[in-house]
């Protein structure tokens, strides 16, 4: 039987209002997910870097509980939480195989609204 290290994928969705982190296996099945609202933060406190720090600590605890050794990280969004989350996961001793930014960038998508004339 082939021995392999258990792998996982972390999706970090960071907006200006919230940070959502999802831990999945290689096939895309969700193992655990956390957001600032789950941890008890409401309103403007959800967008702080402290909330994203607690989210990433919870994710690293669940990675260690599930015996995951290798992690791929996908980051989406422009919020404050992505750098904090990356730093904490990197310092936890988990091997990060790749970090990919999947933030959608429009290539001149929808037409802008007309300018307001006063």
From Swiss-Prot:
Keywords tagged on the record: Ribonucleoprotein, Ribosomal protein, RNA-binding, rRNA-binding
Subunit comment: Part of the 30S ribosomal subunit. Interacts with proteins S7 and S18. Binds to IF-3.
Source organism, top-level taxon: Bacteria
GO cellular component term, pick one: ribonucleoprotein complex
Lineage: Bacteria, Pseudomonadati, Pseudomonadota, Gammaproteobacteria, Oceanospirillales
Family statement: Belongs to the universal ribosomal protein uS11 family.
Signal peptide, first to last residue: none
Alphabetized PANTHER family for the sequence: 40S RIBOSOMAL PROTEIN S14/30S RIBOSOMAL PROTEIN S11
GO BP annotation list: translation
Molecular-function GO terms, alphabetical: rRNA binding; structural constituent of ribosome
Record protein name field: Small ribosomal subunit protein uS11
Gene3D superfamilies: Ribosomal protein S11
Pfam families in the record: Ribosomal_S11 (PF00411)
Function: Located on the platform of the 30S subunit, it bridges several disparate RNA helices of the 16S rRNA. Forms part of the Shine-Dalgarno cleft in the 70S ribosome.
């Amino acid at each position: 039987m082939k021995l392999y290290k258990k792998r996982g994928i972390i999706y970090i969705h960071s907006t200006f209002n919230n940070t959502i982190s999802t831990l999945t296996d290689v096939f895309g099945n969700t193992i655990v997910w956390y957001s600032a609202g789950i941890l008890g933060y409401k309103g403007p406190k959800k967008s702080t870097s402290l909330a994203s720090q607690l989210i990433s600590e919870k994710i690293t605890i669940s990675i260690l509980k599930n015996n995951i050794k290798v992690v791929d990280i996908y980051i989406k969004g422009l919020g404050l939480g992505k750098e904090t989350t990356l730093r904490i996961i990197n310092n936890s001793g988990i091997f990060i195989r790749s970090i990919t930014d999947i933030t959608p960038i429009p290539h001149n998508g929808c037409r802008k609204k007309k300018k307001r004339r006063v």
